[in-house]
Amino acid sequence: MKTVLTLIVAATLSLFSVAFAADTVVPQTTPTATAPAPAVHNASAKTMHHKKAQKPNTIKNTHKTAPEQKAQAAQKHHKAAHSHKAPTVAPAAK
């Protein structure tokens, strides 16, 4: 039983040492043999900045005429002025 356990431990340690050796050994290749990776994949997510798609100026700069603006503003102010009613006081009962 001890020999089986010893063989398993030895096999496990040898596999770990082989994997470690494979990670630490860098194969010597010429730099022209491999294509450089695109810069997009090398940059971290923090440095990436995506710009928003901009709308064309014709959509962005649609101006209302003055009477339409005044009418809309009057409606808003009318609603705001009448939405805050003063509390009504009930007469005290004697």
Curated annotation (Swiss-Prot):
Cellular compartments per GO CC: periplasmic space
Keyword Endoplasmic reticulum belongs to the record: no
Entry superkingdom: Bacteria
Compartments it resides in: Periplasm
Low complexity composition bias: residue spans: 30-40
Signal sequence interval, chain numbering: 1-21
Protein's UniProt keywords contain Signal: yes
Keywords: Periplasm, Signal
Region span, Disordered: 30-94
Biased composition annotated in UniProt, kind: Basic residues: 75-85
Function of the protein: Required for growth and/or survival at acidic conditions.
Family: Belongs to the Asr family.
Record-given protein name: Acid shock protein 1
Organism: Yersinia pestis
GN (gene name): asr1
